[in-house]
Amino acid sequence: MTPLHRIEERLHSLTVRQAIGLVVGANLFLVALAFALPADGEMRGPALLSVLGNFHILALHIPAAVLLVVPLFEFFERHEQATATVRRLSVFSAAGTWGAVLCGIVHAHYNGFSGEGIQLHLWGGIAASAFAGIASLLLSQGFLLRLVGQLVAIGVMGFAAHVGGELQHGEGFPFKPNKKIVADSN
């Protein structure tokens, strides 16, 4: 039996109450960590945790992409019960989003980030993790409810991603031209 099958069996054996507890507990841990490691602008690196925080940039793209793909599988397969593919991708995206947020909290705390935009991105990311977890909890529900849960998770993740993109690439991202293209046209 592969490790993926073992994980899936363990998750499938959870009661509804245990599954809700897992999602709520994991995301409350992120909330507590956000308060314990504030993004207050103080440089604390380079340290091992500072380097770990840098993985936020790497860790966020794969779960976000998978979260975007899950509703496509749902829509085109159209089963009343979630297929194994949908279950696995949904759980992977929820766990990956949680990991990306964890790395982001560490990244902001140890690398001197602060400000309103960082706070908006932080809490948007925590909300994205929570809604990705909720979408995974809805896997036992009917097609329409699962699809709505996944689309809400994508919307919240899109908001957090937009704020993060603006922090990195400037206001108006992604709906403005690349700086190089603008410079070349002048």
Go through each PLM region and give its residues.
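Polytopic transmembrane helical bundles with strong interfacial aromatic enrichment
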Residues: T2-N186
